[in-house]
Amino acid sequence: GVIELPMADVAGGGIVTGSALMGKKPIYIIRYQGYNWLNCTFIVNYACKSNEIWKIPCPLIIRGIASEGSIGPVAGSAHISVIYKMPGLKIFSPMSSKEYIAVYNKFIKSKDVFYISEHRHSYSNKKEFKNEIKGKKDLILMPISVTRFEAEKAKKILEKKGFKVGIIHLVNLK
């Protein structure tokens, strides 16, 4: 079922951590990644470390939403570096529905905390991305998140200028 939490950015992480400890595998949505500082306090200091240090699984998904440029640099940008070094945390940045389903299927089989860095621009995306690394390349692009859309455009521009360009779309970030 769905439980609507109050807009208290600190309390939600604690509630979700407790739910995960009870075996519920919750999905927690952070409305802006800039609020990772507040929302992830309990998650990174207990849920992520729980299985890693104490062998007590605390599986949950965090959906961190990013939206570069529309609401300012503090709240809307992608802020995954804030929590990147936490033990027991897996970070993904799917930009297509198939990538998202693959990440979710990994989570179902896992005991870890998954942070899914989403971008609002990906919600309307119908395209699937393909890595292109065969053959000799002059350069290889390795974009993440929303930059993957622009990297596809940059690849075409560079190829028109005579460069042999490969691209690796990074989804599994940690």
Where do the model's predicted regions map?
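Short helix-loop-beta junction
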Residues: 1, 82-86, 150-167
